[in-house]
Regions:
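Beta-strand residues that line the small-molecule/cofactor-binding core
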Residues: 1-2, 15, 102
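A short, hydrophobic, proline-anchored segment that marks a local hinge/packing element in signaling
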Residues: 2-11, 198
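Sensory coupling linkers of modular signal transduction proteins
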Residues: 8-57
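AAA+ ATPase active-site-proximal loops
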Residues: 38-176, 199, 218, 222-261
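Conserved AAA+ ATPase core "coupling" helix
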Residues: 111, 176-218, 246
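ABC-type ATPase nucleotide-binding domain
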Residues: 188, 192, 255-259, 272
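Short, flexible helix-to-coil linker/hinge segments that flank and couple to helix-turn-helix
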Residues: 211, 262-273
Length: 273
């Protein structure tokens, strides 16, 4: 809804006429490229648990907490599946912007018409104040779309009105879009940069992460899996995990589902990986 008012004078009396106009929402509720959240329905607990440890994990958790206190834009870098979206949600939940909406725009799913509306429609959420907007997978945008976004950010002073968070996949670090966005964010907007390490570089945290996920799947699936055989854990540790935490959760869910013994065997792990 949009409110308009104008002042009228009739028979020496002053009146204020208020018009309420109903216009179509910019986005549909089932649009996968655009989602609206608030502090109660953002999904950040998995990230907080998976990065709440020692070494690199503990430092990441501390950095997120400090970044949340700032008003500066944030650039989140990491491979596919490292939890960039959940990191953005956690920054939002711990920030002073948490009582306003959190707008998540998946740039890999957004259509050209929708993108044009976001940057030009008067009802666009990008015109709001004190909200948080998260451009996920921004490296999926075309160079033309990126240029339009940069122009919009500058002309509307978006970073003075809202909290801007952008994520890039380092799997695409050799693409022009990645370098263009990173340069703009770091050099032009003086953003804060959060680097999420891949799972293969977090060997010290691996057993703790798997124990956490095993417990969750035991509860949700009604199982009582204690852990892994020695050889099975060695197999898990030696695997490269190209899709990182997302892949680990998927694999563990399958392992818990098909395992009938207290410990997951090496043969079972080999069958799934």
């Amino acid at each position: 809804y949009t409110l308009y008012n104008r002042h009228l004078i009739y028979e020496d009396q002053k009146y204020t006429a208020i018009t309420i106009c109903k216009s179509p929402a910019l986005t549909a509720e089932d649009d996968p490229g655009f989602q609206i959240y608030n502090i109660d329905n953002t999904s950040s607990n998995d990230f907080a648990d998976a990065y709440n440890g020692t070494g690199k994990a503990g430092k990441i958790a501390q950095i997120v907490e400090e970044y949340a206190k700032s008003h500066l834009p944030v650039l989140i870098l990491g491979e596919n599946g490292t939890g960039k979206g959940k990191a953005a949600s956690l920054i939002y939940k711990q920030s002073n912007y948490k009582h306003a909406p959190f707008y998540s725009i998946d740039c890999s799913l957004i259509k050209e018409r929708k993108w044009h509306s976001l940057l030009n429609n008067e009802n666009s959420p990008l015109n709001e104040v004190d909200s948080t907007v998260f451009f996920e997978k921004a490296d999926a945008l075309s160079l033309e779309q990126i240029g339009d976004l940069f122009q919009y950010i500058d002309q509307t002073k978006l970073c003075t009105r809202m909290r801007l968070i952008v994520s890039l996949s380092t799997n695409n670090s050799n693409q022009p879009a990645f370098a263009t966005i990173r340069t703009f964010m770091e050099n032009h907007l003086s953003c804060l940069t959060l680097n999420l390490p891949p799972l293969r570089e977090r060997i010290d945290d691996f057993s703790g992460i798997t124990a956490l996920y095993l417990h969750r799947f035991n509860v949700s699936l009604g199982k009582q899996i204690i852990g892994f055989d020695v050889e099975a854990m060695e197999k898990m540790l030696s695997y490269n995990w190209p899709n990182n935490l997302d892949q680990l959760q998927h694999v563990l869910k399958e392992l818990v589902t098909i395992t009938k013994t207290p410990y997951i065997s090496c043969d079972t792990v080999e069958a799934i990986l």
